[in-house]
Each structure stands twice: as structure tokens, then as C-alpha cells.
Amino acid sequence: AAHTGEEYQQEPTKEQIQLATRLTASPDVDMVYCHHSHVVQPWAKVNGKLVIYGLGNLVGNQPSSMPRTHEGVVGRVTFGVKSGKASLSRAEYVPVYIGSPSEGPIRIHAVNAELSSGRGSRARLKETRRQVSRTVRSLGVSGVSER
């Protein structure tokens, strides 16, 4: 994990990309996860390894004036052993919406589960899912599925 990136910027910075490239070049690194931007950032494959540039917010309550800070992603990755080495066997993301304090206690809403159950604002949940999915996949990552 690396605390890196520009706050509130959805695109990874040059420094994030350079760090991910250096780290994934090592045989000792199986995946890179960056955090700091407070917004969802893309997922990518770098040197054949998964890089998660940013998951957004899950606990912080950012000002509503900061775009996209009420969206997040829960990442689920599974590793197996292949030829005696760790190998990524599954990567999934769960789009989430972080509720506002004006709605009562701050809650994390799993977007697809709430859409399936009919709870919450459909328009807001659909927009969150659309935006999160577009951002996660914006660098063309393959082998990652939405849950």
C-alpha cells in the first residue's frame, strides 16, 4: 500500500504511475494499492500485476462541495498459488455510496445490493455505479468484474 496521489483528482498522477511501475517490476510485489485521493481512481495492470490507484472514501466525511467524494469502491482480490508463486486469481469491485450526515448516521451503501432491493435513491445509486465503473475501467483494466 502506498499513500500517494493528488487529493480529489480521479486520474493517477505521474508519481503514482512511476511508483506503480517500479513496485510491480519487483518479483516480491504481487499487487499495488494506493490511497490518498479521496475519490475513486482507475485500476490497471502494470507489468502484469494489478494496481488499484484509489478506492475513494469509506470513512471520511468530505465536504459536499468536493465532487465525487461520496463515491467509493470496496476491492475484493483473491490470490492463489501457481508454480509456487502467489498469483491473482480474482479481482472484483463493489461500488459504494457514502451517505451524507444530513441523512442521519453516515452509512456506506453497497450500490448494487440497494438497487436490487429497491432501497435508496435509484437515480443517485445508478449515477454512482455508472461513475465508479467508468473510472475503475478508464485505463482499460482487464480481468476485473463488478460485484
Where would I find each of the regions flagged by the language model?
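A short C-terminal boundary segment appended to hydrolase-like catalytic domains
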Residues: 67-147
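Conserved beta-sheet core of the metallophosphoesterase superfamily
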Residues: 12-75
